[in-house]
Amino acid sequence: MADERPLVKPLEMSRYCVPFSPFRGRVEEAIVCLVSTAGVRLGSDAPFRAEGDTTYRIIPGEASGADLAFDDTHYDHACAERDVNCIFPIDRLRELAQEKRIGGLTDRHFSMGFTQALRELRETTVPMLAREVDRARPDAVLLTGG
């Protein structure tokens, strides 16, 4: 009898992803930008829509972990509720900058929430976000998820 299971199409976005880009500079001199998909935002900003949201939020470089909230309901929040730095390590990076282990932080960072609207994400959100990150002039970008 023939296998009647439906063929599963691979994740549409996978052929566009580049998971790694080697860093060739000196980490001690690198200005770092944070980009997260964990739904992190300033507590005063509009929440991400938990059912799906293709927008992103800008987080000022001077923000601390205490200023942040997160909305994505698609991962376990146990650790993040104790310390948001496990999903958006802004305080830890600031400590590394004070210790001269990195060059510093950009004046703004970025976060997105959950979405399955991959075409809109790929064609609209990601290009806009990439331009924003480029304008922040980082030497390195740290990507985090939830």
Q: Which ranges hold each PLM region?
A:
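An N-terminal assembly and electron-transfer interface module characteristic of large anaerobic redox
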Residues: 1-146
